[in-house]
Amino acid sequence: MDMSPTPEFPASLEWLNLSKPLRMGQLRGRVTALVFFNVGSAWCQQRLSDLATLRKRYGEHLHVVAIHVPRFDHERDPKRVLKRLQRVPLDFPIAHDADWVLWQHYVIDAWPTVVL
């Protein structure tokens, strides 16, 4: 595993529910869970729901950033992803990593994966 400092979020990420891109520097010193998920997976939907519950329980002591990584071509459309996600109320930033940049940096090999 690469133990280098946490990289800045790549410019290629599309933030689905933020007006301005999130910067990794905004999270420094905070307990943060990066969850790599796929919108088409029921297992991933459950993990997102679990993390939303933990956010409610721990408030500002736990930050969550969800990173959607498409598995199929139709999941590359961020509008479709956002539409699917509106079924579950989530109060944390959601990014669309269409090019798998963060997935590759963290050497992720399965959905869902949570990195603290």
Task: Name each model-derived stretch.
Residues 1-25:
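N-terminal "domain-start" segment that seeds a small globular fold
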Residues 7, 39-43, 49, 53, ...:
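Proline-centered helix-kink/hinge sites
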Residues 9, 94, 101, 110-116:
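A short, hydrophobic beta-strand/beta-hairpin element that forms part of a small beta-sheet core
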Residues 22-46, 51, 64-65:
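Short active-site neighborhood of thiol/selenol oxidoreductases, capturing the structured segment around
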Residues 28-30, 60, 90-91, 108-111:
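Active-site acidic short loop of glycosyltransferases
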Residues 34, 65-67, 95, 115:
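Hydrophobic/aromatic beta-strand patches that form the interior of the parallel beta-sheet core
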Residues 45-88, 98-104:
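Structural microenvironment flanking redox-active thiols in thiol-disulfide oxidoreductases
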